[in-house]
Design a protein with these regions (language model features):
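Extended amphipathic, helix-rich lipid-handling scaffolds
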Residues: 104-156, 192-204, 233-262
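N-terminal beta-strand/beta-hairpin edge segment
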Residues: 38-140
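Solvent-exposed beta-strand/coil patches in large extracellular/periplasmic or lumenal scaffold regions
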Residues: 135-137, 141-218
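Short, well-ordered strand-loop elements centered on a beta-strand within folded domains, enriched
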Residues: 81-89, 105-113, 165-169, 202-206, ...
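Extended terminal
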Residues: 2-7, 27-33, 181-262
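Hydrophobic membrane-insertion alpha-helices, especially the h-region
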Residues: 2-22
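Transmembrane beta-strands of outer-membrane beta-barrel pores
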Residues: 56, 103, 116, 175-177, ...
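Alpha-helical transmembrane signal-anchor/signal-peptide segments
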Residues: 23-42
Length: 262
């Protein structure tokens, strides 16, 4: 009888811990997963229904940090064999962000479902100044402008430590400016990530819509590594105003600034 009583007590305690798991546990997990670069500060509530302030930093021990205004609110519930995450953030998320999280054996899949036919693919917009929290080179560039994210459907899956990306996502950079240039605005840009249905490699494209600072480039995310090559240049008449910025962006080769990652 005592054994059954003890077993019941342990099971009850385990259920209570799962149901009332504090949001701080989720915050700790996010900090560990991102190397301290993305934080849920002042986390309140539980893992299942909570809120926090979103903060970017340059990593553990860094003095650089930047927080978004207001609080991110979320709910997490069961959806069959998966988890359904719903998030709202008045400053930045368009309506409600819905994600489906599918755990598995040595794998985890996060899905952004396609919106209903005719519905907007916009997910939200964030201030470019938020990136300053990541430290170098953003704290030197001091960017301003808006980052608009949209997607018709996207999924990221980690399988035994290897990331596989499918679907499409587009980041529009609007009215970008920097303290390193005397120009009021550098330009407008788009960065596209196109996943591979086979999961081999996701293609990345960077282009300029308009502006004095011309940016182009391409790359791919493959085998959990980012490889990107691009170039930056000044539109005619803007060379002097952009000279310092071009020196910082990449390796100078005449009028060009060459960008290489990975």
């Amino acid at each position: 009888m005592k054994r059954w009583w003890a077993t019941g007590l342990l099971l009850g305690a385990a259920v209570a811990m799962a149901v009332f798991a504090p949001a701080a546990w989720l915050a700790q997990g996010l900090a560990q997963a991102t190397g301290g670069r993305l934080l849920f500060a002042d986390a309140r509530g539980t893992v299942w229904a909570g809120s926090a302030v979103m903060v970017l930093t340059a990593g553990e021990g860094s003095r650089d940090s930047s927080a978004l205004p207001g609080r991110l609110n979320w709910t997490l519930g069961l959806n069959g064999m998966a988890l359904a995450l719903r998030a709202q953030h008045a400053c930045c998320i368009e309506g409600e962000l819905k994600l489906r999280i599918v755990p598995g054996l040595a794998r985890l899949r996060v899905e952004l479902p396609a919106p209903p036919a005719g519905a907007s693919t916009a997910l939200g917009q964030w201030p470019a100044a938020w990136l300053v929290g990541l430290g170098t080179p953003w704290n030197t560039l001091q960017p301003t402008g808006n980052l608009l994210l949209s997607s018709p459907g996207f999924a990221a899956e980690v399988v035994q430590g290897r990331w596989v990306l499918t679907g499409r996502a587009e980041l529009q950079i609007r009215s970008l400016a920097s303290s390193l240039s005397t120009l009021d605005e550098l330009g407008n840009y788009q960065l596209t990530l196109q996943g591979d249905e086979r999961g081999d490699a996701a293609q990345i494209q960077l282009g300029t819509s308009s502006g004095a600072l011309q940016l182009t480039g391409s790359g791919q995310w493959a085998a959990s590594r980012l490889r990107f090559n691009g170039q930056a240049s000044a539109a005619p008449g803007s060379e002097a105003a952009l000279n310092n910025l071009l020196n910082l962006i990449g390796r100078r080769q005449g009028a060009l600034s060459l960008i290489s990652i990975g």
